């Protein structure tokens, strides 16, 4: 059964890119709800787009490896809140790669004057997590990583350009919902999202209470004997 195809230039409140052909309705819907979820989670975020591949010998466990990669990446950044929208792609060579749009909560960070340092550290942690997950050397891992966003995109609901920027970003991301030659798209394995768990403050160890002698009611028990 073929997917419904969107030929118009809009989906809900967003303009979408249909220049090179129609978009899959199930894919654009999945992308839309993932995107709106991120915007509702973060009022101010930095957006980093990149693509990661894996050695072909790991193709059969690609999804599991990228799950491991994300949780390892979050382990490196325990104080960050992160959401990621991913799109799986199969290249002509048969290699599998994932396109990621990462949203980093900007609240703990200084203004974008430090954009380079933020992006540099993100790049380092993303690469390190992938190298460890796929057991690939640091020398070879660069061939599997492609970083697309330079500089980072800043989405801030308090800025006048927010409405324009977040609409432009969705327009760019809508290209990921294009139909492949096989219209029977498995939506769940093609587009999805990762969300970092909120850091929970561990319970402080309970201090032992000092035992206090209870005053006994004289009407029910006899008074203690004198020494």
For the regions a language model picked out, list residue spans one by one:
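"Short basic amphipathic alpha-helical interaction patches in structured regions
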Residues: 64, 99-103, 112-119
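Residue-level marker of positions within ordered structural domains that often coincide
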Residues: 55, 105, 135
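Low-complexity, flexible helical/coil segments
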Residues: 81-88, 136-139
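Alpha-helix initiation and capping sites
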Residues: 60-63, 79-80, 91-94, 120, ...
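Histidine-centered divalent-metal-coordination microenvironment in nucleic-acid enzymes
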Residues: 84-109
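Catalytic "initiation/cleavage/transfer" segments centered on a nucleophilic residue
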Residues: 1-42, 108-227
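N-terminal low-complexity, charged segments
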Residues: 68-75, 95, 153-158
